[in-house]
Amino acid sequence: MIIEWVPYNNLQNIEYLTKGGISEIYTAVWIDGRYEEWDSKEQKLIRYGRQEVILKGLENVENANQRWFEEAESHLKISNKWPQIVQCFGLTQNPSNGNYMLVIDRADIDLRKYLQETQNQLSWKERIKIAHDITLALSIIHSESAIHRDLHSGNILYSKLNQRWYISDLGFCGPADKLTDSIYGNLPYIAPEVISGKNTTKKADIYSIGMLMWEISSGQPPFSYYENDYNLALNIINGMRPKVISGTPLKYENLMKQCWDADPSNRPDIDTLFDGIYSLLQYYQNISNEILQQETNNNLENNKIINNSMSKHINSTLFTSKIHKFKNLPEPKNAIEGMSRKFSKVFKKLNIKSNNDIQINYGKEIVEQQQIRQYNFNIDDEDETYDYKNFHSEEDNVFEIPDGKII
């Protein structure tokens, strides 16, 4: 694939679409379109023709360091090498302000909007297919020794033509001039170790997948009722996770929980995760349509209750990738770890002389009840409750964008 310089005057019908994190997003029509094939007779590349594209602004590129440019260049090559990643055709520059912009293939809808529009109609077979496509794309990214760093439902995109889900924003998911002591990302999806200041690794991407798996199961973004970033960050580090949705397949649930474990070493690598999702998809593909339809009907009312209750609490400002800077946060832990330590101390002080296991189990039960009251809101009469993740951190460093047509 060729990554090229796209003259700004080759773009028409440029219209503002939205603000995506630190970047302004526009739609446009590329007059010539991408290179599509090689004409052996004419001995030249043939272009696609008029093509709808997305323009994504790159802020403060002039202040970026060499490491940022090297990583961006590497990720551009990955996105154009593999069909599971949204293709970036090249770069252009807005002459009115001098800002550089990525020229990206346009998809039909992102995962967040798709789930909100179709959740009540989705079978588990369809949901697992979404998880399959996402994990397949991430397995390719990780196989190239790359890390995404900002996986969330806003940059998982769907193509109706190909009936496939893609990962987008690879390599350009943060400001070029981000300070080294800050993190960038969509807070509900950021891994706890990254929130607490550690470097981003592939296992941080796996954590993000766990939260996406929960969103696929519920139809709603995780932690959507939170108003305060610091409180959410602290609760994530202390082990708060979303409540598993009723009816979630056990294997899917177990994989999801492994992904969002507080200890990165306990999370599966992407190959193990993909194999698990793939085997689950194979199972559901062998189930008869009658059973799948019955399952969909059974989930319909339950999902309506979940969506109606949670949509009232969604904080739209939370689900934007941005720079975060948290100080003096504790080490990440799973919720049960904290409960065990806390209540063993309490029982010692009370001088209760009974079996230690009974004490700790009793303590856990009390804390779980207290934590539900503290962190969740009730969904129905059966006290089904729903909680809710982020990721990003690495040091940056600049190469100049060349004047030539091919980068």
Task: Tell me what each language-model feature is.
Residues 24-59:
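Glycine-rich ATP phosphate-binding loop
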Residues 87-100:
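Short beta-strand micro-motifs within the conserved protein kinase catalytic domain, predominantly
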Residues 97-110:
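Conserved short submotifs of the Hanks-type protein kinase catalytic core
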Residues 117-129:
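Activation segment of protein kinase catalytic domains, centered on the conserved DFG
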Residues 142-159:
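Catalytic-loop of the protein kinase fold
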Residues 154-188:
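Activation segment/activation loop of eukaryotic-type protein kinase catalytic domains
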Residues 205:
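Conserved catalytic-loop aspartate of Hanks-type protein kinases
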Residues 243-246, 260-272:
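A conserved short helix/loop substructure at the end of the activation segment
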